[in-house]
Amino acid sequence: MGAQFQRHGTGVFRTKLNKADHPIMKGFGGFESWDETYVHHLHNENNRTVLELRAEGKEMEPWTWVRTQGKGRVFYTAWGHDNRTWGNPGFQNLLERGIRWAAKDDTSTVPAYLADLPFPIPEMTPIAKNLKPFEFIDAGGKIPNYTPGEKWGVQGEAFTKMQKPLEPDEALKHVSVPKDFEVKLFAAEPDIGGKPIAMTWDERGRLWIAETYDYPNELQPVGAGRDRIRILEDTDGDWKADKSTVFAEKLSIPSTMTFHKGGVIVQNGTQTLYLKDTDGDDVADEKKVIFDGWVLGDTHGGVSNFQYGHDNWIWAMQGYNNSSPTINGKRTQSFANGFFRFKPDGSEIEFIRSTNNNTWGIGLSEEGIVFGSTANRNPSVYMPIPNRYYERVNGWKTNLRLGSIADTHLFDPVTKNIRQMDHHGGYTAAAGHALYTARQYPKEYWNRTAFVNGPTGHLVGAFVLKPNSSDFSSTSPFNLFASDDEWSAPIMTEIGPDGNAWVIDWYNYIVQHNPTPAGFKTGKGNAYETPVRDKKRGRIYRVVYKNKSGKPFSLENASPELLVSTLANPTMLWRKK
C-alpha cells in the first residue's frame, strides 16, 4: 500500500498539492473538508509518488499517493472518513482520477476541478542546471550546526566549510519565481554602503534605504553611529539605481522609516527621530527627537515596520524588548511584542495588541485591515480588535495574545542547504506581511496575497488571505521568491512605485541572532559573535510580472488636480502619498 496507519486526530483542513504534472493532478485544485487527520508510519517509498501532503506539526505528512507493484498500480488517499468528505465534489473528482489511473484508464476525461481553489497555484521557474558550481571556503569550524529534532537547540559538529558569496548578477540566476515573473536587480554593493535593513519611497518615487554596519552587536552612542539613510535614484527610467545620495549619517541601527510633511521619521536605535532637508540638497539639516528611551538591549527585539496608516497615525511593531519610551521627558506606557501606533508629531502613542512572539512584520490592506507576522512558527497574524475596546469593560484583562492564522508554519525552500536553530523546515524568523496593493500582478493577487520573508529558508512566501466571517485564515501555496544560494536572506518585501514587489536581500551567510551557540560569545546586542557575519553586502530586487514596470511617476510639486487624480492610482503607495 505504501504505509501503515499509526494515529489520527480530527479537523477541517486542505492539503498541499504536489506533482502538478502527474496525470491525476492535472486540472485538480484540491479542496477543504473535515476529516480525520491520519498519521502513517512504516512508509514504503519504493516506486511511490506523493500527490498531496498535510501539515502535521513540524512535518508534512504524505496524504495521497500512487505507487506501482509489479504490473499493478496502487492509488491511496487518507481522505474519506464520512459523508462530509464523500459528499465533497472535490473528493469525488480526486477519487475518479485515482480509480481511472489505477485501472490504466484515461484520466484526462475527468473534468477539471478548480472550484475550491483559493488561489491558482502558479508553476515556478526552474533554476538552471548549467550554472557555475558553488565554491566553498574553509570556515574553520565557525558555522554552528543545529540538528533537527523534537529537542530544542541540539548542536552537532560545527561546519568547517561555507559557500562563497556570489556576485549580484550571478546570484540572480539562482532565484526561482512564479512563471511569467522575473527578478531584476535595482541596486547592490558597492552602491549600497552597508547592510540594507529597511526601505521606503518618497513622493518622487525614489527609493530610500536604511543601511547598517552597527547591527547586531555594535549599537553606538547617539550621534556616533556608522549607519546611514541613503537615497537611491533611477534618473534614466531603466529601473536601475544610477544616483546615490547620503541623506543622513552617524545613525546607529536605523531599523525603519516613513515619510511625513517633507521629512522622514526614522527609528534610530533607542530614539525615534524626525529628519528633514530644508535647503533642497537631499541632506538632512533638521532633526527632532519624537520619542526617546526605547530599550534595545537585544538589537533584534526593537521597533520595526513603520507604516503610514489610513487613520494618519504611524503603525509599527515592537519586538520583545519591554519599552516605555518618553515624550518630552515623560515616560509612556510599557509594552513589548506587538502592534502599536503613534501620531507623527509624537503627541500620542498607543499599544494596540500583543502578538505571541518577537515580531518584525506588519501589513495594511487597502481597507486598512491590519496583519502581521512574528518569529517562531507564526508567519501570519490578523489583528481584529485593539486593546482599548477591551479596556472599556471594567475588570476585563487585556493580556490577549494573537496567534497564527496560517494553516502551517512550514515553508517550501528550493534547496536542502538550510541552517536553522529551531523550528526546522519552517518560519522561525518570519518578517513583514506586505499585502499586494497594486494592479500590475494578476487579479488573484490584488489585496488578498501577502508576502512574508523567510530569511533562513532563502525565500519570500506568498500567503493567500481568506476572510472567515469576522476572522481571517491564510495559506501559503507557493513562493514569490526562492533561492538556492545559501547567502540569500530576504528580510523585507514591499510594493514599490512601479506596482511590483521589491525585496531586500540581507545577503548574509549568518542569519541567526541568538541564542549563542556552544563555543561562541554573546555580543552587546545579544547576538552571538562571529567573524563570518557579513557587514558589506546587500541587494535590492524587483519581482516584475511580464516586464510590467510602468512609467516613472512623481508627485513633486504636484498640482491640486494631480493630487486628486492620484487618489485613483492603482498602486496604494501613490494613493497614500
Model regions and ranges:
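Beta-propeller domains with acidic blade repeats across secreted/periplasmic ectodomains
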Residues: 121-568, 574-577
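Extracellular ligand-binding/catalytic regions of CAZymes and related secreted enzymes
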Residues: 58-60, 68-147
